[in-house]
Amino acid sequence: MYFHPLHSPDSSLIGYLLADLDEQEAVVIDPPPRQTELVLALLTERSLRLCHVLRTHVHRADAADCSALCDCTSARLVVGEAAALPQDCSREAMRVAHGARLVFGNEVVRVLGTPGHTPGCLSYLWRDRLFCGDAFDVGSCSAGNREADPGLLFDTLTRRLFTLPEQTLVFPAHPIRGRHVATLGELRARYAPRLQQSRDGFITDMMQRRA
């Protein structure tokens, strides 16, 4: 087992490199922009073959950068079924849905459909670790992000993510209140006041905050 966070020096973005050292196969989740050389160096250092580039989500504004690592390795880009991609990326991408399993070496990553921040958002569950992208970014709904859907986000949090074990370690694409990792139990307690209301109440609350 090998786990290496990838921190962008010029943004708050965080990516993650996972590997099976025995089988020398790896995947990378949400590699930050301009970190391709670093990822390649880490792969070379341990003689790893990159199998997949896993994206939790792709915003229209930065879609062009989504396959940079795939262009210089044999890795396959993996995105959600509803992810917006430029045509040159879309032809090569593997689109996956909730319940899919991705294998690298003897390791398995489970795919969870977690729409809300964007329609095509995915989360990836590996061992006791959840890589959730911006699935907990409630602020994007209240701020009026056009790709965000508060109803879908409510469903994702209450029916999918918060049904996982409380000890699950959550690794986001951006720090959550300054933290790079939290347990699911901690996040459940933090978000409880907003999620104790009904789905319609949550949507209304988000829409009112946009005003």
Enumerate the language-model features and the residues they cover.
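Active-site HxH/HxHxD metal-binding segment of metal-dependent hydrolases
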Residues: 12, 33-110, 190
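Short beta-strand-initiation
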Residues: 1, 11-13, 91, 97, ...
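Metallo-beta-lactamase
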Residues: 24, 108, 118-210
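Active-site neighborhood of phospho(di)ester-bond hydrolases with catalytic His/Asp-centered motifs
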Residues: 28-31, 49-59, 76-81, 114-116, ...
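Glycine-rich, flexible loop/turn motifs
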Residues: 2, 92, 98, 141-142, ...
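Conserved beta-strand hairpin/beta-sheet module of binuclear metal-dependent hydrolase folds
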Residues: 1-48, 123-133
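Short Gly/Pro-enriched turn/cap motifs at secondary-structure boundaries
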Residues: 6-7, 93, 113-115
